[in-house]
């Protein structure tokens, strides 16, 4: 189906999505106008999601599509879905209604394949598709094993952990260590038979991990091939955002779900595929060079950074800098063993020298690949003794309202979904009820009972309550102010629903301004290095590359760390511009990590390198567009 998009329609989308005077690039407009099967390669900071949202908004005005077919939009996190909805919802309410679908690949497979397959198989509904719940069921069942337990207990990595990793095979529903691997032991052995019975029993109870849901989906498609036609008939277009984060298993399933009557556009940057996909080490995106489109222009950084980042591409990619962005020559900070812990202060000095600390929206970060301390080699803690690797900690109750409203990193929400914020908000409301002594029939309220009570006693208010929860969740993640709004809700509507008086203890809980540390299952970082020079001060957050994927910083300092060798040393030829044809898993992984890390800054890129690892190559670095700061090795800074 050919769809024509006019200049006026694009101008309309620009007015909705962009600041006054801003416009979409010609490359973005070409993507918006394209309705063919395409692999769309978008460089860091290209505005690809903005282009996708603009396209969706314009499509929503052309509905209904022929034969009332819909649009399917996949992302890899609920946060990304909410960002798209947040941009588009006020402009197009019907965009998110049937026959369209917006969500993660996992949710789609669960809803349209795994759950129907389960109902057909057992004539009842599933209880949970969740790794944590599934693993807890396995743990409770472990001691009930007989001959298999002895076999598992002998394993070096621990029997329970090994058992929790076993999956239903996607091809034959056997039991294998990987979803596409061979059986973990001979199928005629007592151990295999016992584990097969256990897995099937847990499945019958209604518990699945995410990978087993995929295997159930594969089985469903094998046994009911007509499902592919039904799903393909519903959707005219499929758009997959952040395609580089798709695993080989997800891609294989998508290929089996949609037939040739569906136009599929895959959007992303294959050079940024740094996640391990829960055991699937390979990115599932195989680019078809005959049908690629590119968004090569970055709105994030200038040409001085674009040229350095382009050299790190594993897959050849053109990256054009933003000509309106201030040009600051990227800087190499050279240090030695005795000055490694002065790198962050030198970075802070360079930030202030370039007046970046005066920017309105300033974010300064120092990042590295390896955050775990090493006995002999340098990792992130080597640069700053107070660094502690971001860890997941359990905390569900706090002594003040503000602590329940803290925003979390994208990686934390990536692992848990936006439901994390909803749980925290409900926990805050339940805390209020406990403070004023409101029980239900003498028993403490729970999340489920709270919703049930409001639904039964204030049905007209229930819908508004749910909508407000969703709205507050999105605001919290975007770091927007919600405290006053939620405070007023508790002391007015919430108080009236449960008919309680606001006592002094509740007032203390609500009004306290000291946000406590700690979050339930969240990645918590207090790794803020403070640098001062006279009256000027900058806060530098120290983090891992994985934790900053997708972010934009004012300045980024890439810290050389050790993984089988020093990462900057390993890719120095590429940094200089002499690298070509990368091969070997470690080198390719290294280049992708460095590509993600060095493509974060909008203004200033620094790279910290030990003197031993660039000795004799300073001239090459300078000639290839790097300034070199030798202050920490007793030399003079060398600038182009």
Q: What annotation goes with each model-predicted range?
A:
Residues 1-640:
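The feature marks helicase ATPase cores and/or their adjacent C-terminal helical subdomains
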């Amino acid at each position: 189906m050919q769809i024509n998009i006019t200049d006026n329609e694009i101008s309309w989308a620009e007015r909705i999505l962009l600041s006054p005077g801003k416009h979409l690039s010609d490359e973005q407009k070409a993507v918006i106008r394209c309705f063919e099967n395409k692999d769309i390669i978008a460089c860091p900071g290209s505005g690809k999601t903005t282009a996708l949202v603009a396209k969706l908004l314009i499509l929503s005005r052309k509905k209904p599509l022929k034969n009332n077919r819909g649009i399917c939009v996949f992302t890899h996190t609920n946060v990304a879905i909410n960002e798209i909805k947040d941009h588009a919802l006020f402009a197009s309410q019907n965009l998110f209604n049937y026959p369209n679908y917006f969500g993660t690949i996992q949710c789609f497979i669960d809803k349209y394949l795994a759950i129907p397959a389960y109902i057909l198989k057992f004539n009842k509904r599933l209880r949970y598709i969740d790794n944590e719940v599934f693993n807890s069921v396995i743990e409770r069942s472990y001691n009930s094993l007989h001959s298999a337990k002895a076999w598992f207990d002998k394993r070096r990595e621990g029997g329970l952990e090994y058992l929790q990793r076993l999956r239903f095979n996607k091809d034959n529903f056997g039991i294998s260590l990987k979803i596409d691997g061979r059986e973990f032991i001979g199928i005629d052995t007592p151990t295999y038979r016992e584990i097969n019975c256990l897995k099937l029993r847990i499945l019958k109870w209604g518990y699945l991990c995410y990978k087993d849901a995929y295997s159930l989906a594969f089985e469903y498609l094998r046994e009911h091939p007509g499902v592919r036609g039904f799903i393909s008939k519903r959707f005219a277009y499929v758009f997959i955002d952040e395609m580089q984060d798709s695993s080989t298993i997800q891609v294989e399933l998508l290929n089996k779900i949609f037939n040739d009557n569906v136009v599929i556009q895959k959007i992303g940057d294959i050079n940024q595929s740094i996640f391990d996909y829960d055991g699937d080490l390979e990115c599932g995106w195989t680019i078809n060079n005959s049908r690629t489109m590119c968004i090569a222009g970055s709105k994030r950084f200038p040409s001085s950074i674009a040229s350095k980042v382009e050299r790190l591409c594993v897959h050849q990619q053109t990256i054009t800098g933003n000509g309106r962005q201030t040009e600051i020559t990227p800087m190499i900070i050279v240090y030695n063993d005795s000055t490694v812990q002065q790198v962050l202060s030198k970075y802070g000095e360079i930030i202030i020298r370039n007046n970046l600390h005066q920017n309105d929206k300033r974010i300064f970060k120092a990042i590295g690949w390896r955050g775990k301390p090493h006995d002999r080699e340098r990792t992130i803690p080597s640069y700053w003794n107070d660094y502690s690797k971001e860890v997941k900690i359990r905390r569900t109750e706090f002594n003040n309202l503000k602590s329940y409203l803290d925003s979390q990193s994208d990686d934390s929400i990536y692992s848990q979904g936006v439901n994390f914020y909803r749980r925290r908000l409900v926990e805050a409301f339940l805390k209020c009820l406990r403070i004023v002594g409101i029980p239900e029939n003498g028993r403490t309220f729970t999340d489920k009972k709270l919703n049930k009570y409001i639904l039964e006693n204030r049905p007209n208010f229930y819908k508004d309550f749910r909508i407000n929860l969703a709205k507050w969740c999105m605001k919290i993640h975007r770091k927007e102010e919600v405290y006053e709004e939620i405070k007023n809700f508790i002391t007015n509507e919430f108080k009236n629903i449960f008919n309680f008086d606001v006592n002094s203890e509740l007032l203390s809980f609500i009004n306290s301004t000291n946000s406590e540390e700690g979050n339930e299952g969240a990645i918590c970082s207090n790794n803020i290095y403070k640098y001062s020079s006279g009256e000027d001060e900058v806060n530098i957050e120290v983090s891992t590359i994985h934790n900053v994927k997708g972010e934009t910083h004012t300045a980024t300092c890439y810290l050389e760390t050790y993984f089988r060798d020093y990462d900057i040393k390993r890719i120095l030829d590429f940094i200089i511009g002499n690298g070509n044809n990368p091969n070997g898993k470690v080198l390719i992984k290294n280049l992708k990590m460095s590509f993600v890390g060095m493509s974060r800054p909008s203004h200033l890129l620094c790279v910290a390198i030990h003197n031993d690892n660039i000795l004799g190559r300073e001239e090459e670095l300078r000639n290839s567009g790097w300034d070199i700061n030798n202050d920490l090795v007793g030399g003079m800074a060398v600038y182009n």
